[in-house]
Amino acid sequence: MFSKSVTLAQYDPDLAAAIAQEDQRQQDHVELIASENYVSCAVMEAQGSQLTNKYAEGYPGKRYYGGCEYVDIVEQLAIDRVKKLFGAQYANVQPHSGSQANQAVYASVLKPGDTILGMSLAHGGHLTHGASVNISGKLYNAVTYGLDENEVLDYAEVERLALEHKPKMIVAGASAYALQIDWAKFREIADKVGAYLFVDMAHYAGLIAGGEYPNPVPFCDFVTTTTHKTLRGPRGGVILCRDNTHEKALNSSIFPSLQGGPLMHVIAAKAVAFKEALQPEFKQYAKQVKINAAAMAEELVKRGLRIVSGRTESHVFLVDLQPMKITGKAAEAALGKAHITVNKNAIPNDPEKPFVTSGIRIGSAAMTTRGFNEADARVLANLVADVLSNPEDEANLENVRKQITALCDKYPVYGA
């Protein structure tokens, strides 16, 4: 019998110490990685609940195990809430990740060797959209599109490639593209060649839920998202559709094809996050995320840096570091010393290797969750520029670090 009185610190002090150190790091550093965010205490409570003990293969009302009457309630809450959030008729909340959600979509209607048309990883796409190193690029014949000379998504190229290659599926969505994507234009192109349209909205889902970015669901055959990033939920995935045409194929593609039992404690945490995203205050959050990202981009341009695509219309943007004569790898390290966390990221036509890069990716979702406003975002952008202008000067890094500490103390991740 387990005792409820035994704490993790008592039983496993080594692990507890590592968790405490990570908790302190999150408090002391400003998080600018676009794919990261902070979840509420309610989300963490759900994910740390006794639901982790329950196996529940199948779907609500159709389980292969007994004792599922309460986890059925949990999963149905998550399904109903996410459908309401995005105006979908179908939802599957079981994918363990966005990548697995994407795999399930492909497997539901494609056969190995079928052609897919997705955004190039080098131009801001995602590994799972047909990159050669990913299963999507190994199992299917992947053709890629990119940005035009102005670093705007090249819809003319998408149409030309679609007409030339006749893909069975067109994939839209990105992991490092700052501007709004025209879902209606993609629908028009897909219809011209009789292709399925699949949108991966993982990065933009929170903005879409908050009404600050166009909703792809009405235009698409399939939509996937992660539940973290801008949506501020636990790490996981979701599949959505505007109707129930592919319900049977998608459900079987997740279980039993790709996964076994769902993670009921994570699904519970998803349900909490969906409820949070349905509240009026989430709309204010999404609006502030965009304001903060735009403010940071503007300040960095004033400091001599170049923003890929010229601006941002979302939570994310890429910074071209070539004018500063510094690589993304070096910038990430220097900013880290100043307690600013970013990730190195390739820019279009990047001359550097993927593990070095000529850019960094910046996102405003996590800092906005802490409470940073537009004025704070502008201060922060100038601190980033201070580091990049003199990345090897320890006194400079120390000065920035002190100012970051003051900002972080002003906006704790978790208040009283």
From Swiss-Prot:
Any matching Pfam family: SHMT
Gene: glyA
PROSITE patterns registered for this protein in UniProt: SHMT
PANTHER family: SERINE HYDROXYMETHYLTRANSFERASE
Designated name of the protein: Serine hydroxymethyltransferase
InterPro entries attached to this UniProt entry: PyrdxlP-dep_Trfase, PyrdxlP-dep_Trfase_major, PyrdxlP-dep_Trfase_small, Ser_HO-MeTrfase, Ser_HO-MeTrfase-like, Ser_HO-MeTrfase_PLP_BS, SHMT-like_dom
Catalytic activity line of the entry: (6R)-5,10-methylene-5,6,7,8-tetrahydrofolate + glycine + H2O = (6S)-5,6,7,8-tetrahydrofolate + L-serine
Cross-referenced HAMAP family: SHMT (MF_00051)
CDD domains named in the record: SHMT (cd00378)
UniProt function note: Catalyzes the reversible interconversion of serine and glycine with tetrahydrofolate (THF) serving as the one-carbon carrier. This reaction serves as the major source of one-carbon groups required for the biosynthesis of purines, thymidylate, methionine, and other important biomolecules. Also exhibits THF-independent aldolase activity toward beta-hydroxyamino acids, producing glycine and aldehydes, via a retro-aldol mechanism.
Listed NCBIfam families: PRK00011.1 (NF000586)
Oligomeric form and interacting partners: Homodimer.
Protein family (similarity comment): Belongs to the SHMT family.
Domain of life of the organism encoding this protein: Bacteria
Organism whose genome encodes this protein: Neisseria meningitidis serogroup C / serotype 2a (strain ATCC 700532 / DSM 15464 / FAM18)
A GO CC annotation given for this chain: cytosol
Annotated site residues (Plays an important role in substrate specificity) in this chain: H228
Pathway: One-carbon metabolism; tetrahydrofolate interconversion; Amino-acid biosynthesis; glycine biosynthesis; glycine from L-serine: step 1/1
A GO biological process held by the record: tetrahydrofolate interconversion
Alphabetical UniProt keywords: Amino-acid biosynthesis, Cytoplasm, One-carbon metabolism, Pyridoxal phosphate, Transferase
Modified residues (N6-(pyridoxal phosphate)lysine): K229
EC top class, as a word: transferase
GO function term, MF aspect, one: pyridoxal phosphate binding
Compartments reported by the entry: Cytoplasm
Binding site for (6S)-5,6,7,8-tetrahydrofolate: L121, G125, H126, L127
Entry cofactors: pyridoxal 5'-phosphate
